[in-house]
Amino acid sequence: FGTDPLMAQELARRAALRTGGVVMPTLFLGTERERPAQILKDKGFENAESMYVVGMDVPKNSVKSYYAREDLFAVTVREHLRLLVQQAYKLIVIVNGHGAWGQREQLDRLAIEFSNETPSRVIVAFPNVARAGETLDFGHACEVETSLIRYLDDENVDLSQFPPRDVKLAYTDWGIADDCVFEGKPTPDKCVLCDPRDATVEAGERYFGAALDHICAQVDAAYAALRA
């Protein structure tokens, strides 16, 4: 409810300043699907086959995520797109800050449909925080994402709520996961590798700058294609 739309909102605002265009009010709505048993096993859950976990809402996570149903999410975005097409926008950019598979699939599907069935071109921009030749583990609520939100709103990030740094963060205890978990290659001890307690404002500024550059390049390319 906070991190993902806040990051997308600021990226959209700054990209519009650089490339031109207007920014619609932020849609504070996201979706998620149930986790496959294999991912739950890779997180360290022993009873994965009998568990029902939606997104990052593991049983011990203290705050539930603000997940809407996937069909409601898609219908809501569809209606926003329909209204924007009526306003005769030639290029509509959806800046998505949430990496859930279902959310990205729905947005990509709608972008393809509207680009082919209406006069508008719709593209989906997702923040790529790595520079050319750089490999980063974005993860969920790990160092990268925490650094980003520290850069955007450091006053509302309280890392002191975590245990001391020498205490490992088990995937089963927190709504935190490295990319390697979703790739089927979890850490041997099933604990967080890219620790959010290592997050800094400076790193967040660097990641944000990379994401902004990538999105602006994507928008510029779409503009150029429309003019061709």
Task: Report residues per predicted region.
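Extended, histidine- and acidic-residue-enriched regions that form the cofactor-binding/catalytic faces
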Residues: 1-93, 97-228
